[in-house]
């Protein structure tokens, strides 16, 4: 390898990373800003304890190495189509584990307390080869995960767990609606609700793809952070489970003039200006998120403690219903000076409604109060 390398520490792992002007110029991609993303999945794997796991698009191998060092996983697969990445992954595994690699063709295996398999191939080809093999697969591509989703759903066990990241915010947030229609088979919504609608479009398309294989699913956690969308789902075996899951699909109707929205669970939209289809079911399993938070607070070591604590705390407390009111956007539309979020939440609760902040927007409130009530509370002096 002719790359100039430097050492990076993240969590319990240390990895060699190529020197480059920007992360996008690097011959092998490593993004330090995605460390919290990796922290969250490490916490999840400690709660759910899958044994055989795959990081399908590994680059430097940081995610897979952290799985090996920081989770109970027993067999960890790391894969990248890039030969330089493959060579770097081998170096990085040996930087963290004492021993030797047994290499055969484009696969190197480390046997120790854990089995680590380093693979140099197209992710789709590897996942097609390992049919119903993995307890957990993580798809964290550069851009859209859609070209890998089908194969991942066939490679993971029928009751396995799938992690999916999408970093193509422009299509999912409605800036490129045609690209969203092509890739995610859904119409996105531009504006203040775009991050939640984008998250729900991603979860919705996973549900539709899974249903083809007579699989249902439960959302363990889905969120938006730092320009990426993230979803973890647990698959459920059987056509009936698939049918039940599809009942959570539907559409959002949004009035641009007033900021009023409605949601409808339906396979087809019943009126114009529908955004979707998208997921209208829960975006979290309360128990799983609670256990992740508990683990973190108990002193579990992650790379970005404060950031992840803030995120998980917000996700845990957040009201799990579709969409929210953005106080600034509503204030602009209705020509009202927006009040403090805390005041609005307090007022709504005193009226018997549920209300919380949302991680999707620093100026947003999730509530089961009707639009008219929310506006009335905003107008109050």
From Swiss-Prot:
Its EC number is 2.1.1.216. It catalyses: guanosine(26) in tRNA + 2 S-adenosyl-L-methionine = N(2)-dimethylguanosine(26) in tRNA + 2 S-adenosyl-L-homocysteine + 2 H(+). One of its GO terms (biological process) is tRNA N2-guanine methylation. Keywords: Methyltransferase, RNA-binding, S-adenosyl-L-methionine, Transferase, tRNA processing, tRNA-binding. The keyword RNA-binding applies. It comes from the Archaea. S-adenosyl-L-methionine binds at residues 38, 63, 80, 122-123. The keyword Cell cycle does not apply. PROSITE patterns: SAM_MT_TRM1. Pfam families: TRM. InterPro entries: SAM-dependent_MTases_sf (IPR029063), Trm1 (IPR002905), TRM1_arc_bac (IPR022923), tRNA_met_Trm1_C (IPR042296). Residues 6-378 form the Trm1 methyltransferase domain. One of its GO terms (molecular function) is tRNA (guanine(26)-N2)-dimethyltransferase activity. Monomer. NCBIfam families: TRM1 (TIGR00308). Dimethylates a single guanine residue at position 26 of a number of tRNAs using S-adenosyl-L-methionine as donor of the methyl groups. Belongs to the class I-like SAM-binding methyltransferase superfamily. Trm1 family. This is tRNA (guanine(26)-N(2))-dimethyltransferase. It comes from Pyrococcus furiosus (strain ATCC 43587 / DSM 3638 / JCM 8422 / Vc1).
């Amino acid at each position: 390898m002719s790359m100039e390398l430097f050492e990076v520490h993240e969590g319990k792992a240390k990895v060699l990373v190529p020197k480059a002007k920007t992360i996008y110029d690097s011959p092998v991609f490593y993004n330090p800003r995605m460390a919290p993303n990796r922290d969250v999945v490490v916490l999840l794997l400690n709660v759910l304890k899958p044994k055989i796991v795959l990081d399908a698009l590994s680059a430097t191998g940081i995610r897979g190495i952290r799985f090996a060092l920081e989770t109970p996983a027993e067999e960890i697969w790391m894969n990248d189509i890039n030969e330089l990445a493959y060579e770097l992954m081998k170096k990085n595994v040996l930087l963290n584990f004492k021993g030797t690699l047994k290499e055969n063709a484009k696969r190197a295996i480390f046997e120790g307390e854990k089995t680590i398999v380093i693979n140099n191939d197209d992710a789709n080809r590897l996942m097609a080869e390992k049919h119903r093999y993995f307890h957990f697969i993580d798809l964290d591509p550069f851009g859209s995960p859609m070209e890998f989703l089908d194969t991942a759903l066939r490679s993971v066990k029928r009751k396995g767990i799938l992690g999916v990241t999408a970093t193509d915010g422009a299509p999912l947030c409605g800036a490129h609606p045609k690209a969203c229609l092509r890739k995610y088979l859904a119409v996105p919504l531009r504006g203040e609700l775009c991050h939640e609608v984008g998250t729900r479009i991603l979860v919705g398309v996973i549900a539709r793809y899974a249903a083809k294989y007579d699989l249902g699913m439960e959302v363990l956690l889905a969120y938006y952070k730092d320009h990426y969308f993230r979803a973890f789902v647990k698959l459920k075996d059987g056509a009936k489970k698939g049918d039940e899951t599809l009942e959570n699909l539907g559409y959002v109707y949004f009035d641009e003039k007033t900021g009023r929205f409605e949601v409808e669970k339906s396979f087809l939209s019943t009126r114009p200006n529908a955004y979707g289809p998208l997921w209208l079911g829960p975006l979290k399993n309360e128990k799983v998120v609670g256990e992740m938070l508990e683990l973190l607070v108990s002193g579990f070591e992650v790379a970005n403690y404060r950031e992840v604590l803030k995120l998980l705390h917000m996700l845990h407390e957040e009201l799990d219903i579709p969409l929210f009111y953005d106080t600034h956007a509503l204030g602009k539309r209705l020509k009202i000076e927006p009040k403090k979020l805390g005041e609005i939440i307090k007022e709504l609760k005193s009226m018997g409604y549920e209300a919380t902040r949302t991680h999707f927007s620093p100026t947003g409130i999730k509530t089961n109060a009707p639009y008219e009530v929310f506006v009335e509370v905003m107008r109050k002096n």
